[in-house]
Design a protein with these regions (language model features):
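A short glycine-threonine-serine/GTX helix/turn-capping micro-motif
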Residues: 20-28, 74-78
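Hydrophobic, well-ordered secondary-structure segments
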Residues: 13, 29-37, 50-54
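ATP-binding/phosphotransfer module of carbohydrate and carboxylate kinases, centering on a glycine-rich
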Residues: 38-198
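A short alpha->loop->secondary-structure connector
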Residues: 10-18, 22
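Short, charged, low-complexity patches
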Residues: 25-34, 160-164
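Short beta-strand-to-turn element immediately C-terminal to the catalytic PLP-Schiff-base lysine
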Residues: 5-9
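Short, small-residue-biased leader/transition segments that mark boundaries at the very start
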Residues: 1-2
Length: 198
């Protein structure tokens, strides 16, 4: 759930957040996974208290900490998706009462909530925000924390569509077209078929 477009009827689209994967990753799976790795490395170096993230990440890595770097930077299997795959450990460790996981969780929810505070200036009253993405779908506690961090006038609603649907809708808006219910139905059916037969 990284903001992309603010749509106010009769006005041009405005952008908040969504500045790309090199700059604007606040609260994303990549950022949570990266921060989990950072805290695990810090703990094993003795730069902070121990965190359960060390054991959880070591179990997922399948190798001891001194071999993590080669997996993270592997040109074939490492990189951003690999790093994002560690995000779920934040939620596991947080459920165990881990201090580092709680900090990562809180910071991510706050960064996503901030987007709604920036968007609020464009609306006179309540405004809807579609919540989407693997983290808010699979971890309802994260969605709830984002809701709490959001602007009081932001109506946070589950999207019910894959994130790519929002990109398609935005593309139509960019060319002055209005996506209606038929577009949504056709898009979601085509997407479902594509998922069955990649």
């Amino acid at each position: 759930m990284l903001f992309r477009s603010i749509r106010v009827e009769g006005q041009p689209l405005r952008k908040v957040g969504g500045k790309g994967y090199l700059i604007d990753t606040g609260g994303s799976g990549f950022e949570l996974g990266r921060d989990a790795l950072i805290m695990a490395f810090r703990a094993t170096d003795g730069r902070c208290e121990h965190t359960a993230l060390v054991e959880l990440i070591e179990a997922q890595m399948g190798v001891p900490v001194d071999r993590w770097m080669e997996k993270i930077y592997d040109p074939v299997t490492g990189g951003r998706p690999f790093i994002a795959s560690f995000a779920h450990n934040v939620f596991k460790a947080r459920a165990m009462g881990d201090w580092a996981a709680q900090e990562i969780f809180d910071r991510g929810a706050h960064l996503l909530g901030d987007l709604t505070h920036a968007a609020a200036k464009w609306f006179d009253g309540e405004f809807s925000v579609a919540m989407n993405g693997g983290l808010v779908i699979n971890f309802p506690e994260y969605a709830e924390a984002i809701r709490k961090a959001a602007h009081p006038r932001a109506k946070m609603i589950p999207s019910g569509a894959p994130p790519v649907y929002g990109a398609a809708v935005e593309a139509l808006w960019d060319i002055g077209m209005e996506p209606g219910p038929a577009f949504r139905e056709h898009f979601l059916n085509a997407y479902a078929q594509m998922q069955k037969n990649p």
